[in-house]
Amino acid sequence: MFLTKHFVFVHIPKTGGNFVHRILQDHAPADWELKIFDVHATYAEIPESHRHLPRLAFARNPFSWHVSWFHFQQQERDAFYMAISDNGTLGFKDAMRRAYTGNGVLANSSGALTQTLFEMLGEGLEGAKVGKIESMREELLRMFGECTEVPTKMVEAIQQVPPQNTSTHAHYSTYYDPELRDLVRQKDAPVFDYFGYQWEDAPP
């Protein structure tokens, strides 16, 4: 989480937060009073001094988000990943089915991205300004600009700085079969519907 006197940026995992971190750390004016808070702190942890400020964040197509999260966890291997992947032995499709069906840990709840967004930004995202990572540069300029004047050097950096901490993998569509595609669409329906996300085939 990044605190300024103009806004609070909440870092949703796997939605470009490292890019935002670099932009703010390298280019935020001193009078923005930038403070780096706990990396993945939620809206409930925003200090009282900043709770009146706009909450900014990014969302991502859930189909893409699940694939990115899975690849990241193949290195991190946290307890949740180890549980759904049978200690790292299952591939993406089998691990996701294990999480979302039968006795899986998320079988009787909403999808992982829906839960993450609501936990970190508030149920229904009320009061939050949430951009789409698929057009991150334009969205970041828009969201910052709605809160304060954005310095020219920061505008240039947002337009030019390379993506940060990205994982290398094929287009998300190659990871799904029709059954898993429908399952994730159902589980994360609130995110798909709120942001207008849809399935996209890999570019030719």
Annotate each language-model stretch with its function.
Residues M1-P204:
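Membrane-interface amphipathic segments in extracytoplasmic regions
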